[in-house]
C-alpha cells in the first residue's frame, strides 16, 4: 500500500518544505548543473540515464512539488519503496537543497523528448488504449493528475507496467 497520501506535511516542517520550493522556484545559476549531477549520480541507475527505465516511473517533466514531497516522504519513512527497495536510503542521503535542485532539474526536462518505443501495431493495442482512456475519464483521474494539481504526479506518458503496479498499491 502506498503511504504517501497518508503523510501529513507537518511531519516535516513547513519551513523546510517552503525552503526547498524556494530553491525550485528561484535557483542560483549553477542549480541546473547541480540538479543534473544529482540525478546522474543518485537517480539515473534506476530511473534511466535518458529518463526511461524498466520498473521505475519516468521522472522527466514531473511536478517539482510532487518530487519534493515524495523524496521527503521517502527520507522520513512516510513512504516505503516497494518497487526497488532503495529509495528510502537514497533519499535519506540527500540534503534539502539537493532535493530542491533535483526536483527543479527534473521538472525542466521535457518528457516529449524521451525515446519511448510504443508498438501501436501490437495486437489489442487500440482496444487497450481506448479502454484506458475511458477508465481515465470515468474515474476522474485527471482531477488530480493533470498539470494544474501540483502535489499529484503526472501520469500521462508513464509506462503501463509502472501504472499497473502503482495502482495495485492503492487498493
Residue map of PLM features:
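Bacterial N-terminal signal peptides
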Residues: 13-25
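Short microdomains enriched in Cys/His and/or Lys/Arg
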Residues: 64-74, 160-171
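Axial heme c-ligation environment in periplasmic c-type cytochrome domains
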Residues: 53-60, 74-110, 114-122, 150-156, ...
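Disulfide-stabilized extracellular ectodomain repeats and their linkers
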Residues: 40-43, 56, 64, 84, ...
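Sequence/structural segment immediately N-terminal to covalent heme-attachment motifs in c-type
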Residues: 31-49, 115, 120-147, 159
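N-terminal targeting signals for Sec/Tat export/insertion, comprising classic cleavable signal peptides
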Residues: 36-61, 65-73
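Extracytoplasmic/secreted proteins, especially bacterial periplasmic and envelope-associated proteins
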Residues: 34, 38, 66-69, 86-89, ...
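N-terminal secretory signal peptides that target proteins for export/translocation
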Residues: 1-12
Amino acid at each position: 500500500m502506498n503511504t504517501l497520501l497518508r503523510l501529513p506535511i507537518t511531519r516535516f516542517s513547513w519551513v523546510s518544505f517552503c525552503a526547498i520550493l524556494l530553491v525550485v522556484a528561484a535557483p542560483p545559476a549553477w542549480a541546473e548543473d547541480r540538479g543534473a549531477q544529482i540525478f546522474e549520480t543518485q537517480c539515473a541507475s534506476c530511473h534511466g540515464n535518458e529518463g526511461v527505465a524498466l520498473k521505475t516511473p519516468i521522472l522527466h517533466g514531473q511536478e517539482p512539488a510532487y518530487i519534493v514531497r515524495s523524496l521527503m516522504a521517502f527520507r522520513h519513512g512516510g513512504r516505503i519503496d516497494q518497487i526497488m527497495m532503495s529509495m528510502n536510503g537514497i533519499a535519506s542521503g540527500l540534503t534539502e537543497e539537493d532535493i530542491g535542485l533535483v526536483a527543479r532539474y527534473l521538472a525542466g526536462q521535457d518528457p516529449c523528448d524521451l525515446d519511448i518505443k510504443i508498438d501501436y501495431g501490437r495486437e489489442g493495442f487500440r482496444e487497450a488504449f481506448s479502454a484506458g482512456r475511458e477508465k481515465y475519464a470515468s474515474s476522474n483521474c485527471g482531477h488530480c493528475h493533470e498539470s494544474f494539481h501540483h502535489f499529484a504526479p503526472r501520469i500521462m506518458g508513464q509506462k503501463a507496467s509502472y501504472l499497473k503496479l502503482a495502482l495495485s498499491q492503492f487498493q
